[in-house]
Amino acid sequence: MAKLKIKKYGDPALRKRAEAVSEINEIIKELASDMLETMYSASGVGLAAPQVGILLRFCVIDVDPNKKSPIVMINPEIISGENKITAEEGCLSFPGFYGNVNRFENIIAGYTDLNGNRQEIKAQNFLAKALQHEIDHLDAKLFIDYLPDWKRESIEKKIKRKKKAGDW
C-alpha cells in the first residue's frame, strides 16, 4: 500500500471527466487500496480517482467514524434521489475550505464492486451526500460549482493568495 498525492484545486485533472473502468484487475485493486490509505491518512470520508490524478470512474468512501466500512465503487451512478437539503461540505482537494451545498438527502446508487458484481446501495444523509460529492468528481464537477458566485469567488481568491505564498 502507498499513500498517493491528492490533487488540489487548480490541477487540470480535477476538471476532466473520468472514463469508465473496463476491467477490474490487480492494478485497480491496488489503486483502490492505496486510495483508501490516502483517504484515511487525510482524515477524509471519500476520495475519487481524479483527485489522485487517475481519470477512471471509481471512488472510495467510508463515513464510519471508526473507519471500518469502506466502499469501493467502480463506475458508480446515481439511480434516483429525493428530498434536497443544504448542508456544509468540504473536499480533500480544497483543504480548509467549506461551503453549503444543496444535495439529495436520500439516494439509490448503482456501482460495480471489486469482485465485478453489480451492487445497489440505498444511502441517506451523510453517506448520500458523500456519494453524490464523489460521483460529481468523476464528472469533473466540484463542490464550489454549487456555491453562490460571491462564495466561490471568495474561495478562489484565498486559494490564489495561498498559491502566491507557496502554501498550496
From Swiss-Prot:
Coiled-coil stretches: none
InterPro entries: Peptide_deformylase, Peptide_deformylase_sf
SUPFAM superfamilies xrefs: Peptide deformylase
Enzyme class: hydrolase
Tagged with keyword Cytoplasm: no
Enzyme Commission identifier(s): 3.5.1.88
Keyword list, A-Z: Hydrolase, Iron, Metal-binding, Protein biosynthesis
Binding site for Fe cation: 91, 133, 137
Cofactor(s) essential for the protein: Fe(2+)
Any one of the GO BP annotations: translation
Function noted in UniProt: Removes the formyl group from the N-terminal Met of newly synthesized proteins. Requires at least a dipeptide for an efficient rate of reaction. N-terminal L-methionine is a prerequisite for activity but the enzyme has broad specificity at other positions.
Stored PANTHER family: PEPTIDE DEFORMYLASE
Name this protein carries in UniProt: Peptide deformylase
Species for this entry: Endomicrobium trichonymphae
